[in-house]
Amino acid sequence: MSLCNLAKIRSVAIKAVEKACIACLDIQKQLISEDTINKKDQSPVTVGDYTVQALVINELLKGLDEEYPIIAEEDSKTLSSQKDVESKVLSFFNRYSNESFVESQLSSLLDKGNKKKDLNSSNRWWTLDPIDGTLGFLRKDQYAVALALMEDNKPILGILGCPNLPVSKGSTEKGCIFVGLKNKGSFMIKLSNLDQEEPIKVSNQSDPTKAIFTESFVSRGFGHELNQKISNSMGVTAEPLKIDSQCKYAMVARGDSDCYLRLTQLDYKECIWDHAAGHIIVEEAGGIVTDFKKQQLDYSKGFKLENNVGIVCSNKLLNDSLFDSIKKSIQF
């Protein structure tokens, strides 16, 4: 099997995520209101999830010569039973893809992302989280379209579309795409100017007491409590940056934050699509991503990181201090 040129794959993947980001902004504008927020209505993010998955898969299929297996979150079964949601998804998809699909074609496309393993026969495969950060999406806050290309069960290309993320710290302009390609570095692209790529690097902060952590808005399990324990052990004084989704990886890769830790429960296993894209982007920006036992992330065991305990992401310079404090703060 001939393999596509990685530069072409990178270009097509960026375009796919860009289309998805623009669709997400439109879906938020049209479907999310104060009323849906107050009612905790999940339907806008459901429309977004399915629309983005269909758009990204369609762009990959149209733009690339080789069709790699795709592991994504959604399939068509649930959607087909929600006709009102399905009609909205079809409308948004056709608008942003310039297609004229009917329901059956949409279902077939969505199910292209239903490669429920075994991927051992495939050297390369995609993993996609259409909207990572459901709560952020519904609040019109931070969320990400997360796409990664895997090779031999390791991420070699990551794209994070962050439609609501400021283009720089303190900027009022929002909308970024982050891309990392193995051995080629990481870059940020503004949604307002897709022709210009800006190289990004992790911070050079080496003083543990000055480290800036990033964590989720909402604590799950003992996550925030443990993070505070570890940061206190390091002598950190700054408040953590609270942000939803894999945008946390982008913050570390761009140098806005120095560390991102995630451990909610000792027995909880992370989904591969929640980390693959951010992982390679941080590494190519000069950072490091392991688990709490300092083990490499193992993407070979299905949909979850079955062999790993949590996530430790840093600018690399702070890694020794982080793990010294981790050892003092939790027993495995």
Swiss-Prot record:
Report the SUPFAM superfamilies cross-referenced here: Carbohydrate phosphatase
At the top of the EC hierarchy, this enzyme's class is: hydrolase
A Pfam family that this protein carries is Inositol_P
CDD domains given in the database record = PAP_phosphatase
InterPro entries recorded: DPNP, Inositol_monoP_metal-BS, Inositol_monoP_superfamily, Inositol_monophosphatase-like, Inositol_monophosphatase_CS
Which GO molecular function, any one, fits this protein according to its record? metal ion binding
| Single biological process term from Gene Ontology | sulfate assimilation
Instruction: Cite the binding residues for Mg(2+) 1.
Output: 73, 129, 131
Binding-site residues, Mg(2+) 2: 129, 132, 274
Q: Which UniProt keywords apply?
A: Hydrolase, Magnesium, Metal-binding, Multifunctional enzyme, Nucleotide-binding
- Keyword set includes Nucleus: no
Catalytic residue list: 49, 134
Task: List, separated by semicolons, the cofactors it needs.
Answer: Mg(2+)
User: What family does the database annotate?
Assistant: Belongs to the inositol monophosphatase superfamily.
Q: Report the protein name in the record.
A: 3'(2'),5'-bisphosphate nucleotidase
Please tell me the species this chain comes from: Dictyostelium discoideum (Social amoeba)
Lineage of the organism: Eukaryota, Amoebozoa, Evosea, Eumycetozoa, Dictyostelia
